Amino acid sequence: MQAIKCVVVGDGAVGKTCLLISYTTNAFPGEYIPTVFDNYSANVMVDGRPINLGLWDTAGQEDYDRLRPLSYPQTDVFLVCFALNNPASFENVRAKWYPEVSHHCPNTPIILVGTKADLREDRDTVERLRERRLQPVSQTQGYVMAKEIKAVKYLECSALTQRGLKQVFDEAIRAVLTPPQRAKKSKCTVL
């Protein structure tokens, strides 16, 4: 059985731990508790292949900036997360998370994940953002960011409703099992 290490990164409170708890237990945790999810191992089938999926949660808060990279060695795939209702967390994908993971693991595939998809249409959420002259991150913005950071895929999900949740992890596994073909560069040969 092939083992795959999947590390989840992103700003504090974007829903990384909820994503993992909801996926692994099929239940949404009640209140926000900064990262307490232990590394978790799940045996799953993707495209008829048995996979041992190791899930590593990380703390997004700045206090952990020096500690977090200790979980990066031997990572097979990163989930870089932001909350669709938090434009600042989206900007930090470009400003912080992509630079950090690409520095430590330059050839490791990235899946860009927009969390809290259920809040994009939530009236209270939209109103709170509007009061600050902001709006939820659009799907188009997500696709543009994914291209910019060379992510294998851009996906949106809700840990609360579980919409798109399984797909996030299935696509993370596929990114490792069937890496995208790199464009072949012609090599210069001097004779």
Curated annotation (Swiss-Prot):
Localization recorded for this chain is: Cell membrane
What would be one Gene Ontology cellular-component term for the protein? cell projection
What mutagenesis or variant effect is reported for residue 60 to R?
In n3246; in HSN neurons, severe reduction in mig-10 ventral enrichment and mild defect in axonal guidance but normal final migration to the ventral nerve cord
| UniProt xrefs under InterPro entries | P-loop_NTPase, Small_GTP-bd, Small_GTPase, Small_GTPase_Rho
One Pfam family it belongs to: Ras
PROSITE patterns per the UniProt record, alphabetical: RHO
Q: Which UniProt keywords apply?
A: Apoptosis, Cell membrane, Developmental protein, GTP-binding, Lipoprotein, Membrane, Methylation, Neurogenesis, Nucleotide-binding, Phagocytosis, Prenylation
Which residues are noted in the entry as GTP-binding? 10-17, 57-61, 115-118
Q: Which GO terms describe its biological process?
A: actin filament organization; apoptotic process; axon extension involved in axon guidance; axon regeneration; body morphogenesis; cell chemotaxis; cell migration; cell projection assembly
Q: Lipidation sites of kind S-geranylgeranyl cysteine?
A: 188
Superkingdom of origin organism = Eukaryota
Q: Where is the signal peptide?
A: none
**Listed PANTHER family:** RHO FAMILY GTPASE (PTHR24072)
Q: State the oligomer form and interacting partners.
A: Interacts (GTP-bound form) with pak-1. May interact (GTP-bound form) with mig-10 (via Ras-associating and PH domains). Interacts (GTP-bound form) with chdp-1 (via CH domain); the interaction facilitates the localization of ced-10 to the cell cortex.
Family that this chain belongs to: Belongs to the small GTPase superfamily. Rho family.
Q: Any idea what this protein is called?
A: Ras-related protein ced-10
Organism, by scientific name, is: Caenorhabditis elegans
